[in-house]
């Protein structure tokens, strides 16, 4: 019998090694199954999809450093801030904008309550998340009543669970983030397009020409007719004021047209002079559904406002020139304790003084009664 050659010995050695390796893997696989584990091979037909990962940056415990263990990532804001929705459309716009600005200023997360979302979301592309009712009920809130102008104390609020109340609507809260506010209050396309279609059909009555400038006019009436004189010793915009405001635009803009909206349209028809053919009574005046009137005003180039937050926001978002009713209360009005004109109207806006003679007469008739009792 011939002794095995060197080649045969090498092949036999390789066969033994292969059998040993296979036996080792087989035992390893059985052990893994016995301990409740399983090996799986990646599917070659498709790439694995990574699951969402939440990264939490823990603070470094070293006293020599204040940095986060996740370099370059700012710490996530803690706590929850919200605001109690109160009042009508313009009030809630002011509350939304103030909440957003103050939360950012203090590094907190802002949430709105469902009622505010229901009021604003059908009109605007707002982005603040909605706070679940259960979370609202179970949270131990610190409540803070805001006055209607920015104060230094509001820039260093430390409560992590804060619920604002009040009716803030001052540009001093949010004007530094104006472009962000304008994005939040972007109209939905169907509202913007409907308003632009209506404006595009307007013609000047005397010439039939297309107007070159659109001036939105908002005339606030309704409950203010009683509230202003009886509670605040003030007035609303009257016929003379509106005439002055419109003449101001006629003197500065060629071929303007005035698009009037109001919650008192009958009064507007009777008191606004439309004989020049440059006035259109376009609003529906429905306070329960303000979207169409508001969309019309914001799509105009300029604004005439009387008083109220609805007119303020229409002017703020429209941009351009704004004429407003100035000094509409008596100097001793309690209203001036909660309202600062310099914080309510932008410095570049133009004020026309109100005629206070009606409320002076009314105030004079009250004066003798102050000394009784």
UniProtKB/Swiss-Prot annotation:
Brain. One of its GO terms (molecular function) is galactoside 2-alpha-L-fucosyltransferase activity. Residues 1-12 are cytoplasmic. The gene is FUT1. It is found in: Golgi apparatus, Golgi stack membrane. InterPro entries: Glyco_trans_11. The keyword Lipid metabolism applies. This is Galactoside alpha-(1,2)-fucosyltransferase 1. It comes from the Eukaryota. Pfam families: Glyco_transf_11 (PF01531). GO terms for biological process: carbohydrate metabolic process; fucosylation; lipid metabolic process; olfactory bulb development; positive regulation of cell-matrix adhesion; positive regulation of endothelial cell migration; positive regulation of endothelial cell-matrix adhesion via fibronectin; positive regulation of sprouting angiogenesis. Pathway: Protein modification; protein glycosylation. It catalyses: a beta-D-galactosyl-(1->4)-N-acetyl-beta-D-glucosaminyl derivative + GDP-beta-L-fucose = an alpha-L-Fuc-(1->2)-beta-D-Gal-(1->4)-beta-D-GlcNAc derivative + GDP + H(+); a ganglioside GA1 + GDP-beta-L-fucose = a ganglioside Fuc-GA1 + GDP + H(+); a beta-D-Gal-(1->3)-beta-D-GlcNAc-(1->3)-beta-D-Gal-(1->4)-beta-D-Glc-(1<->1')-Cer(d18:1(4E)) + GDP-beta-L-fucose = alpha-L-fucosyl-(1->2)- beta-D-galactosyl-(1->3)-N-acetyl-beta-D-glucosaminyl-(1->3)-beta-D-galactosyl-(1->4)-beta-D-glucosyl-(1<->1')-N-acylsphing-4-enine + GDP + H(+); a neolactoside nLc4Cer(d18:1(4E)) + GDP-beta-L-fucose = a neolactoside IV(2)-alpha-Fuc-nLc4Cer(d18:1(4E)) + GDP + H(+).
